[in-house]
Design a protein with these regions (language model features):
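Glycan-recognition surfaces
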Residues: 1-56
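Solvent-exposed, flexible loop/coil residues
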Residues: 23, 27, 41, 55, ...
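A broadly tuned preference for mixed-charge, low-complexity surface segments
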Residues: 23-37, 97-101, 151-165
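Flexible loop/turn segments at secondary-structure boundaries
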Residues: 29-31, 52-54, 60-61, 95, ...
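Catalytic cores of secreted or luminal carbohydrate-active enzymes
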Residues: 38-89
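Conserved, mostly hydrophobic/aromatic
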Residues: 44, 111, 140
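Carbohydrate-binding surface patches
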Residues: 91-133
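C-terminal beta-sandwich/jelly-roll accessory domains of carbohydrate-active enzymes
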Residues: 117-165
Length: 165
């Protein structure tokens, strides 16, 4: 997905929150690519976040997703616009891209992972974690595991298999 490379490269020179990042229509009018609404929102969350599509054309289910995505944007605003940004993968990683936001006070963090390619029989994805306070405790909202920042920073997290790109 081109947008991932754009945001990755731009983040070396500008604050990630200043990058224009919007959920576009699907299929995309420039690339013809079809990407799930949830993935497009995850990528846009690592930027200015917005929608560049005709909301009237969305299904009721998609409108409910948009409402939840906007709520998440507000819930994570302090992280994505005021927190520290970490690139967790290199640009040449062809299977997935991951990044992290950590609050300035280190009380919470947001890790996002986006699968770039679909392959048969995919392996679980392991992601390094950075920037957490060693002596603080953090709970993973994905699986409920509670660990110290030191443990998360050294061990990272292994995610379940991705089944779709």
């Amino acid at each position: 997905m081109n947008r991932l490379d754009i945001q990755y490269g731009t983040s070396f020179f500008y604050p990630i929150s200043s990058v224009g990042a919007h959920v576009s229509a699907c299929p995309n009018h420039q690339t013809g690519r079809s990407v799930p609404l949830s993935t497009r929102a995850d990528v846009a969350l690592a930027g200015s976040f917005g929608y560049e599509l005709d909301l009237r054309l969305l299904s009721d289910e998609e409108k409910a997703q948009v409402k939840e995505q906007i709520k998440e944007f507000h819930d994570y605003y302090d992280l994505t616009h005021e927190g520290d940004y970490y690139r967790l993968t290199e640009r040449d990683n062809t299977s997935f891209t991951a990044w992290e936001f950590v609050a300035k006070n280190k009380e919470r963090a947001l890790v996002e992972v986006v699968k770039k390619d679909a392959w048969g029989n995919p392996l679980p994805v392991h992601v390094a974690i950075k920037g957490l306070e060693d002596n603080s405790m953090y709970v993973c909202s994905l699986n409920g595991i509670k660990r110290s920042g030191k443990t998360w920073n050294h061990a990272g997290i292994t995610l379940p298999k991705f089944l779709s790109a």
